[in-house]
Amino acid sequence: FAGSEGLSIRDLRFILKLMVWLNTTSTGDREEIRLTNADQRLWERVCGRSGDDCYNRESDCFFRQARVKASESEILVVNHALLLANSQASGSLLPEYKYLVIDEAHHLESEATRQFGARVSRWEIFANLDRYLDTQGPFARIAVLVLSQAGSLLRDTLSPAVVTSSRDALDLVRGGLTAWFKSLSDLIQEPLSQKKSRGSDSVRIDDRVRDLPAWGLFMQQLDDLYVNASTALVQIRDLNDKLESAVDAGTIVSTPWISDLGICIQEVHDLFVFLSELVSHPRKDVVYWVTLDAAGEGVTVLESAPLEVSGLLQEKLYQDLESVVMTGATLTIQGEFDAMRDRLGFADAEEVVEQSPFNYKKNVLLVTPSDMPPIDSPKYEQALGDVEIG
């Protein structure tokens, strides 16, 4: 990434921030560095998701270091997000374990709903596609690589023209997605205008939306786009296979740009699997909705979430464990665990309620200051700081 040409000022600022942070961090933890929304999009280009996507295997990799350290530990302490991400990744992120204690278990349902659902950002889709299609992107770099390194015998099957054809096929998909998002934004204007609550710019994709007269044409538009995407994926897979064969044969050298093709294939495939489900094959146990940009730029986010996560937690998290213990201060309603049992898929568990040793009447003081500025006042933070310091 840092070696790419044509980096913007924003890219360079992010790289400088990253370099300063890398000199101080020992863990590589995302929570240690403060990122803006724009930075977060760039972070996705450099972060590790499995430890297997590090281009330089001999370099320090925080992910692999953490995994080695975890494998040598007898007790692991992780947050709900990592615990569930591990279950989604078939246990590849954490060492194998048989005993699990979940503290603050009343938060598990909301995190499971988020992780077992899906979220697709329009900005992220086009940022990724533009990165692949850029004049300094992987297709352009690979075309130069093939021209300079591939022998004459190989150029009949692996030529710059083959690379360019794959890039053009992906560019056609990008253009189709632009038109598709515009159609979706136009389509949901009617249900958006009928919403009783105007405080939200989100619209659920339900039967009311699917029964709109324009929905059939909208589905056909996605079907046509899917054909173009399938064609592009076939070409890019073929190109990727030829490049990997050439690398194995020693005809060309391996570069991160070739690895990028594999990532591109997976991203485009996953995107169209989600779009197909949302538009053409919705599941009855899943809720789908879209969010519009407040500045009037149309639909910016597509999301889905399971209606309930108890079965998914049982299948993905609990079933292979010998013991699961859940603790929390608010697991009961009127002293009963029934509601939480149902929501967390914990029907057969033993239970115990321990009274809190904390003496609220003696140890808690509720103070309402009368001389504070309103919470939306520019002076509020300074006044709050003065009170805390005092």
Regions found by a protein language model. Give the residues of each.
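A contiguous, basic/glycine-rich beta-loop/short-helix subdomain that forms a polymer-engagement track
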Residues: Q40-L76, H80, L84-G91, A229-M372, ...
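Short, conserved "post-DEAD/DEAH" coupling segment immediately C-terminal to helicase motif II
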Residues: A89-P95, T113-F126, G311-Q319
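Charged, amphipathic alpha-helical oligomerization/scaffolding segments
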Residues: E72, L100, R131, S165, ...
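Conserved Walker B
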Residues: S73, H80-A81, E104-L108, A112
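A substrate-engagement module of RecA-like helicase motors
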Residues: F1-E74, Y132-D134, R141-D156, P160-D168
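Conserved phosphoryl-transfer catalytic core
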Residues: A2, H106, S110-S202
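Short hydrophobic beta-strand that contains or immediately precedes a catalytic carboxylate
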Residues: V101-I102, L108, S323-T327
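Long, low-complexity or tandemly repetitive, helically biased scaffold regions used
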Residues: V162, S193-L217, S230, V234-T251
